[in-house]
Amino acid sequence: MTVTDIASRTYNHSWRLDPIIRSLLDTDFYKLLMLQMIREDYSNQQVTFSVINRSRHVRLAEIIDEGELRAQLDHARTIRFTKKELIWLAGNTFYGKTHMFSADFIRWLAEFRLPEYELRKVEGQYELHFHGPWTHTTMWEIPALAILNELRSRAAIKGRGRFELDVLYARAKAKLWTKVERLRKLENLRLSDFGTRRRHGFLWQRWCVEAVKEGLGPSFIGTSNVLLAMDNDLEAIGTNAHELPMVAAGLAKDDEELRWAPYRILDQWRQTYGGNLLIALPDAFGTKAFLRDAPEWVADWTGFRPDSAPPIQAGEEIIAWWEKKGRNPRDKLLVFSDAMDVGSIEETYHHFTGRVRLSFGWGTNLTNDFVGCAPDGSFNLDPISLVCKVSSVDGHPAVKLSDNPEKATGLPSEIERYLRVFGDVGRVRKPVLV
């Protein structure tokens, strides 16, 4: 394993274009899983993804040079899956299953390229949209966010001295290792890297993954980043995302179809995949609404990934639902991944251990925690909340309600309609930091 001196590489940066995205596998595993199903069942749907900066106080268009951003986006569009990558996808075992991806899908990937983008500046922010077939626009989400976050990081460290950069990265490494030492104390912990989309940079994410792999040993069960999984002989981790119910809801012709849209697309998911991939994401239109109306077969799924409610509150609610359905929570799995850090991982672990199977996805606070590390005390490396969500489906506006109204996306009039259909019970507003 070659260890890169990140500080030296940053300081010596002099080339015209240092590509942020170098592989189409530099994405989250669930994008490929969803893509295979999308291609089978939704190949004709036109879906727009839009970047949203929830941290409005950070004016990205005044920090990131537009020419540099366009150059990175343009470069990403030139990348194709390599023969080596396709052979690995076709032949590897994922979640205990061989041939997770069909031969026909692998052949289709060989010709895949990212579609065009639409970019403009508006009031200090970038408006970045990806229009086209869902089979193609979906693959922009992760690279677009990674590009924006890394360009912001590069702008923040530009002009810093060689030794200042040494100190910056030394402090960040020590900070991470302190977290690893705390996590080592949690017996039978199961933790994965979920930090691609909001990482400080690719090299930093790679360092973090390799460090946690060494530091936690078998407690580190894998990474959502497909490229890092391939390069580091790790499990690729991930199931499905909010875009599935958001698109299904956007296609609904009336309120009754809207109410059942999340379950209809999950039923398609279980027909495509099974076993350990049966993890439901319940909060797209509110967890309480999801559990209230869920068909009986949802209780037979492997587990849930609570994503926007406070973790202990969400976990207790799901456990109570399982018990009401006559299922034993000890046989089920909860995957906690919303802004988790060492403190919330410890608290959630101690609260639920022995009552339910647990797994944790560690994202931004693993791969982009430079808070307090800058020698000059600046805050411009602190992480921001940047997302890329479905904004329209076949010309109809898309909506995400979330358990936290601060995370809701969509037109106000459409949000009101969705609240009328799904209800507003159990949604609690809290600040969104990452």
From Swiss-Prot:
Post-translational modification: Transiently phosphorylated on a His residue during the reaction cycle. Phosphorylation strongly increases the affinity for substrates and increases the rate of nicotinate D-ribonucleotide production. Dephosphorylation regenerates the low-affinity form of the enzyme, leading to product release.
Residue list for modification Phosphohistidine: 242
Catalytic class of the enzyme: ligase
Catalytic activity: nicotinate + 5-phospho-alpha-D-ribose 1-diphosphate + ATP + H2O = nicotinate beta-D-ribonucleotide + ADP + phosphate + diphosphate
GO MF entries: nicotinate phosphoribosyltransferase activity
The keyword Phosphoprotein is annotated on this UniProt entry: yes
SUPFAM superfamilies linked: Nicotinate/Quinolinate PRTase C-terminal domain-like, Nicotinate/Quinolinate PRTase N-terminal domain-like
Pathway assigned to this chain's UniProt record: Cofactor biosynthesis; NAD(+) biosynthesis; nicotinate D-ribonucleotide from nicotinate: step 1/1
GO cellular component terms given for this protein: cytosol
Pfam families according to UniProt: NAPRTase, NAPRTase_N
Enzyme Commission number: 6.3.4.21
Top-level taxon in the UniProt lineage: Bacteria
Keywords: Ligase, Phosphoprotein, Pyridine nucleotide biosynthesis
GO terms of biological process kind: NAD biosynthetic process via the salvage pathway
Functional summary from the UniProt entry: Catalyzes the synthesis of beta-nicotinate D-ribonucleotide from nicotinate and 5-phospho-D-ribose 1-phosphate at the expense of ATP.
Family that this chain belongs to: Belongs to the NAPRTase family.
Entries under NCBIfam families matching the protein: NAPRTase, PRK05321.1
Identification of the protein by name: Nicotinate phosphoribosyltransferase
Organism: Bradyrhizobium diazoefficiens (strain JCM 10833 / BCRC 13528 / IAM 13628 / NBRC 14792 / USDA 110)
